[in-house]
Each structure stands twice: as structure tokens, then as C-alpha cells.
Amino acid sequence: MICYSFAKNVTFAFLIILQNFFSQHDEEYKYNYTCITPTVRKAQRLESVINGIMLTLILPVSTVVICTLLIYYKWTKQTITSPYLITLFISDSLHSLTVLLLTLNREALTNLNQALCQCVLFVYSASCTYSLCMLAVISTIRYRTLQRRTLNDKNNNHIKRNVGILFLSSAMCAIPAVLYVQVEKKKGNYGKCNIHISTQKAYDLFIGIKIVYCFLWGIFPTVIFSYFYVIFGKTLRALTQSKHNKTLSFISLLILSFLCIQIPNLLVMSVEIFFLYIANTSCLGTIQREIVQIISRLMPEIHCLSNPLVYAFTRTDFRLRFYDFIKCNLCNSSLKRKRNPLTIKN
């Protein structure tokens, strides 16, 4: 897959660059770490409040969706996209849990050591990459399904291979994220997780990592989903029968909702890279950069909230499965024989 080969090359390149960059420590990077104004504190506190509100919605909804899809897929195995959707929602849940830990750590409600900080940030970056790439995979499968009108790809080994490749590539893309993690020690080796940049070359490498993430989290998903939105609008309506119009409308809604979140996210990431590039160490520049980074950190949470709501509860099929889940009917063999959903549904 493209993401796998790209991630592999990027990871090896970063490791080589890292070895060359950090072999020299004579150039000290001057960064204004002391400019913490009331505006920055209020923005950080507002970020924590917004994260708390989103997490109270994301975690319960994702749990219900995961349980419903797991039980339904275990007893019916009717749709090929169900395993992909399950891993997508699990990845979103892991991302939300890491946000919860980082928020508690920033508010001094919990302390982490160096290894835990690196692990949390690694999972944060890997889950974000995995979720965005998995959305593209699901859209590709839906396009192939509607175009061919049949599913010829029900091999579990094939599904496991795709998930495994995507998992490994996401993990490799997340490796650079842990390079700058340091702990502001408060209780022994435990304290607050921070991003510390010690040299100018390390700062340049940090900007390079941000550019790669801008491609993986911004440009790549936006281009892929824009392409699919155009294809669904022009090609699939001419190929599919009228009975699939609801499915086409549903897919268009999914992609359009994604683009409504992703395009502003891409703009915010581009502005963040711009502020990092100009390296304005004044107090005003630090405040502007911090506010942009706060907005950039909130955008993935909006994705995590929208995925289960749009991909699950806006679809009639899932609502029926959810009602069966509440009524404990998913394990009813007679109901299982009665219901034989279309292969394109999930």
C-alpha cells in the first residue's frame, strides 16, 4: 500500500537524519518557554473543558457502536466493512483515551514518567494516522462494492493483512512523535509531559515531522475523499440501480461530513507549520502559535466524535442492529435467519 511504503521510507529517513542531527549539541536553540500569559492559560483551560465535554460523548457512543458491531459481525458475518469499522472505532477510542491522559497530565491531576509520556504520544499519533487511513480504505471498499455490485473479498486473511499493514505503517509514522518528549519532573521521575526542543537542527527536524503529519493527516485524506466524492457523484449513480440511491446518498453524506471537518483541519495545520517556520520567539508569536496548536489538537477529537455518529447512527441498518442489541436479539438464531441484509450494507 502507498501509506506503508511511504511510512517506511519516511521512518528510515528520520532515523538517519536524527543520528546526524543529534550528534552535535553545540548550537543551542533559543525558544521562549516563559511566556505564559493569562490568555494562554485561559486557552489551555478552555481546551481541557472542550476535551472533557467531547470525551463524555465519544467514549460511551464508541463503546456502544463497537459492542453492537462486534456481536453483529460475530453472528452474521454479512459485510466485509464491519471489521474495518470495528478497528476504526477502536482506534478512535484509543485516541480519545490518550487525549484524556494528556489532559489530566496537563492539569496536574496525574503524573507520568518518560516512558509513559512517550507511549501515550506514540498511541496518540498512531491512532490518528490509522483512523484517517482506514476511512480511505472503507471508502475504497464501498466504491468497489457498488461498482461491481458484488463482494468478492470476504477472505478473513485478506482483512487481517490489510489491517496489519495499516497498523504497522501507522506505527512507523508515529515513531518521530516521541523524539521530543521530556518530563517536567515533580514527584521523582514523574511529572508533566512536555515537548522540548534543544537545538536549531532539532527544531528544523521538528518542522519536517510536522510537514509529514500535515501530509498524512491533512493533504492525503482530503485529496482521497474529494476524489471519491466526485466519483460517487458522477460515476456510481450511472452504474448502480435505483434501489441503491439511499446507499449513495449515505456515502455522499459520510464523505461530505468528513471534508467539512478535514478542510479546516488542513488549513489549521498549514497555519501551524507557518508559525513554526517563521520561528517568532516574541511573546505575541508564542501566544499565536500556542492558540493555533490548541485548535489543531482539537480537530482530531471532532473526527472521533463524528465517526460513530455519522457512520453508525445515521444509517438505518445500524439503528436496527442497535435496537436488536438493546433487546438482546442479536444472538437469536431465528432472527438471524430472517434477516439477510444486502452485501453492500453495513
UniProtKB/Swiss-Prot annotation:
User: What InterPro entries does the database record attribute to this sequence?
Assistant: CCR1-9-like, GPCR_Rhodpsn, GPCR_Rhodpsn_7TM
> Where in the chain are disulfide-linked cysteines found?
none
GO BP annotation list: calcium-mediated signaling; cell chemotaxis; immune response; positive regulation of cytosolic calcium ion concentration
Q: Which domain of life is it from?
A: Viruses
TM spans (from-to): 32-56, 84-108, 116-142, 160-181, 209-229, 246-272, 287-310
Naming one, the record's GO cellular component terms include: host cell plasma membrane
Q: Print the keywords alphabetically.
A: G-protein coupled receptor, Host cell membrane, Host membrane, Membrane, Receptor, Transducer, Transmembrane, Transmembrane helix
Q: Which residues lie on this side of the membrane: Cytoplasmic?
A: 57-83, 143-159, 230-245, 311-346
Answer yes or no on keyword Nucleotide-binding: no
Work out whether the entry's keyword set contains Membrane. yes
Q: Which SUPFAM superfamilies has this protein been placed in?
A: Family A G protein-coupled receptor-like (SSF81321)
Q: Which residues lie on this side of the membrane: Extracellular?
A: 1-31, 109-115, 182-208, 273-286
Q: Cite the Gene3D superfamilies for this sequence.
A: Rhodopsin 7-helix transmembrane proteins
Q: How does it sit in the membrane?
A: Multi-pass membrane protein
| Cellular localisation | Host cell membrane
Which GO terms label this protein's molecular function in UniProt?
A: C-C chemokine binding; C-C chemokine receptor activity
Spell out the Pfam families in the cross-references: 7tm_1
Q: What is this protein called?
A: G-protein coupled receptor homolog U12
In its UniProt entry, the species of origin is given as: Human herpesvirus 7 (strain JI) (HHV-7)
